[in-house]
From Swiss-Prot:
UniProt keyword Methyltransferase present: yes
Gene: trmD
Family (UniProt): Belongs to the RNA methyltransferase TrmD family.
Gene3D superfamilies reported in the protein's UniProt record: 3.40.1280.10, tRNA(m1g37)methyltransferase, domain 2 (1.10.1270.20)
Annotated protein name in UniProt: tRNA (guanine-N(1)-)-methyltransferase
Keyword Cytoplasm in annotation: yes
Main location: cytoplasm
Reaction equations catalysed: guanosine(37) in tRNA + S-adenosyl-L-methionine = N(1)-methylguanosine(37) in tRNA + S-adenosyl-L-homocysteine + H(+)
Species whose genome carries this gene: Listeria monocytogenes serotype 4a (strain HCC23)
EC number(s) stated in the UniProt entry for this protein: 2.1.1.228
Length: 245
């Protein structure tokens, strides 16, 4: 996979690409990440990327020209691919695990990270394929959001995680929150690991994990259960918890 990031603050990404799983993914050639300062594509000797909005109003808008030209330039470097051009914007579609899995199937992603009051609307209408939001709040720019999406996508690529099952069993990958985890010692200052996890009975352990995953979701994110395909056993557990309230 190739990931291009367009930002006027490219140095923000050095910490993300130079550490942990993303660094290893780059070193192992599972992904190539290139960060471009789209100010370099702005016309005029001062390379101005923003301007006042027509009709007045507060703030400055990112101009269409430098972003259109920057996207065209990264496309020309990968002419064999048809990239998803992703605009990080609070008005976009809420990012979730399903979207991460969808993006992970692509060959080429281009992230546009904005600043100031917003974008010239022609960028949305004629350039991007996806508008993505990481939540209902405002950040200074799109860089942090792009980092979040990029991390979520890269860890899904084949060969990136050491354990191939890790991405499958993570919270949200199954549609439910993940079950509790414990490691040694079995008794830490009187706080004990559930006996069933020490039993060696894998069928019991899997059922316990399934039940705890459902319970955690029911207690913390009941909205996730709205369209979840519950088994008969899971329905019985939910009824027990509901009746005990």
């Amino acid at each position: 996979m190739k990931i291009d990031i367009l930002s006027i603050f490219p140095d923000m990404f050095s910490g993300v690409t130079g550490n942990s799983i993303i660094k290893k993914a780059i070193e192992n050639e599972r992904v190539a990440v290139e960060v471009t300062d789209f100010r370099e594509y702005a016309e005029g000797k001062h390379h101005i990327v923003d301007d006042y909005p027509y009709g007045g109003g507060a703030g400055m808008l990112l101009k269409a020209q430098p972003i259109f030209d920057a996207v065209q330039a990264v496309k020309e470097k990968q002419p064999e691919t048809k990239p998803r051009v992703i605009l990080m914007d609070p008005a976009g579609k809420r990012f979730d695990q399903k979207m991460a899995e969808e993006f992970a199937e692509e060959e080429h992603l281009v992230f546009i990270c904005g600043h100031y009051e917003g974008y010239d609307e022609r960028i949305r209408e004629h350039l991007v394929t996806d508008e993505v939001s990481i939540g209902d709040y405002i950040l200074t720019g799109g860089e942090i959001g792009a980092m979040i999406v990029m991390d979520s996508v890269i860890r899904l690529l084949p060969g990136v995680l050491g354990n191939k099952d890790s991405a499958v069993t993570d919270s949200f990958s199954t549609g439910l929150l993940e079950h509790p985890h414990y490691t040694r010692p079995a008794d830490f200052r009187g706080m004990k690991v559930p006996d069933i996890l020490l039993s060696g009975n894998h069928a019991w352990i899997e059922e316990w994990r399934d039940k705890e995953s459902l319970k955690r979701t029911y207690e913390r994110r009941p909205d996730l259960l709205k369209n979840y395909p519950l088994t008969d056993k899971q329905k019985t557990w939910l009824k027990e918890w509901s009746d005990s309230k």
